[in-house]
Amino acid sequence: MIPIDIVERGLQDYAACFDEMQTFTARRGPDTPDTIWLVEHPPVFTLGLAGDPAHLLAPGNIPLVKVDRGGQITYHGPGQVVAYLLLDLRRRGLFVKALVDAIEAAVIQTLATYNVASERKAGAPGIYLSSGPHAGAKIAALGLKIRNGCSYHGVSLNLAMDLSPFTQINPCGYAGLETVDMVTAGARDASGRAVDANDWQTVSRDLANALVAQLQQRAQAHPAEAATA
């Protein structure tokens, strides 16, 4: 089983992290370890390759960074857990669809650990609350880039955020889409304590461990047939 390193990078400027992801992927060799970076960003909007700038309704003083992932516009900020997956998909024998499925399953698994019920939506990547007063609201977004069979970018899970910047955009291109965090969803740990921003490290580690478990479950027997983008 091919290991996956987990690296806690803490608070980091988005543009600098984006540059590092591109450089890491461009310099990969056959023996470069697969890794998951756990990051928190200062406030920033990011717009995907095919993103429509019209979905940025009111930028205010939050910078916009155009990036090479799929998807539309999203927001990153303090209190959000971001996991970047820098993986050699061919070596792991993973197709892109299996990677997306693993990411979404890991988020659902992590939220369930904190007593938050969530689900996928067909045709709308990400994870959404499945019950309660905020049913249908988005709590996690994902976007990926595959280059020479290797992935970067990843998934963001809203933990304890100022959610107001999401009202300045059409999140992921959907006008009026409600966006929530784990605090709003009433997340609680195993002891019944309500989670807050101080749980960032614990939640990020839980998400990373769930990602590793889901990815290992989906490893294929024939790596050469995997991702070719």
Curated annotation (Swiss-Prot):
Site (Lowers pKa of active site Cys): 138
Binding site for substrate: 69-76, 141-143, 154-156
Organism annotation: Ralstonia pickettii (strain 12J)
General remark: In the reaction, the free carboxyl group of octanoic acid is attached via an amide linkage to the epsilon-amino group of a specific lysine residue of lipoyl domains of lipoate-dependent enzymes.
Record localization: Cytoplasm
Matching PROSITE patterns: BPL_LPL_CATALYTIC, LIPB
Catalytic reaction list: octanoyl-[ACP] + L-lysyl-[protein] = N(6)-octanoyl-L-lysyl-[protein] + holo-[ACP] + H(+)
Span of domain BPL/LPL catalytic: 30-223
Protein name: Octanoyltransferase
UniProt-listed Enzyme Commission number(s): 2.3.1.181
